[in-house]
Amino acid sequence: MVHNETLLVERVQTGVRIEKRLLKVLKAFADYHDLTLGDLLEGIVLHAFDGKTPFTQKSLQRIRELKKFYGLELDSSASHRLKETKASRPKGGRDS
């Protein structure tokens, strides 16, 4: 695949629930790189699917700064262990 060609895709709107501070870091990081949140997430996921890191050392440093600024102390060890507080759960939401 040529890496500088534009690829046409069909995007869909989705609603996902995500940890509040994590979302703040992602939005700030996307804004820093002049990307939409969707573009950033697509890039992260596509890199992960290929077993590649999506971030340079400079980007990782910026992420560390943003995590500190927004008080995000979570790291990869928290994956799949997060549970919503009852106050943040939507009415009729599932407990999983």
Predicted feature locations:
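Short, basic amphipathic alpha-helical segments that act as recognition/interaction helices
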Residues: 33-60
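Extended hydrophobic secondary-structure segments
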Residues: 17-23, 38-41
